[in-house]
């Protein structure tokens, strides 16, 4: 893992009453961050992560923000979280717990965050899930192999594995989340996330290589 501090769009957070430490993003060498994206503070980006133009991954208030391997963060996506510490103490209701560790936002492996979507912590998104264009996940957990269709809102609930949220739906009660439809073989978007992950991991590696070539030629 590398501490990347040379680029103006990738830098440490500032100290504040809710965040006593300056932390620099931890970024795998195979991840790619577009120069017009911002990655700030206590953030982990795993292998082959793609961060597209105008995306913001900001671990300066709620933190840490963890992005696992093979995740794509598309154009204008926002990852941010509510204050996770107050006077040096953990705000328990403002974090999600994964394997005994606490996070403002946790994005699992092979998740797609499509254009203009937002995941605002405390929030967890399970592996192989697709979060559609302009969708919002806030104070919620989303299981694995799910699809959040465009412009849907998921707030204050736990979405079970293998469910989809219809486009434009407002899911704000646990009853509504529990009654979401299961993804079947006939569901039109069943294979979408796998295809999107395939494209974006290849783009991350390609742009990373191109970026290295440009620096060598400079």
Regions found by a protein language model. Name each.
Residues 2-22, 26, 60-69, 74-105, ...:
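Glycine-rich hexapeptide-repeat left-handed beta-helix
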Residues 27, 31-59, 65, 72-73, ...:
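A positional/architectural concept
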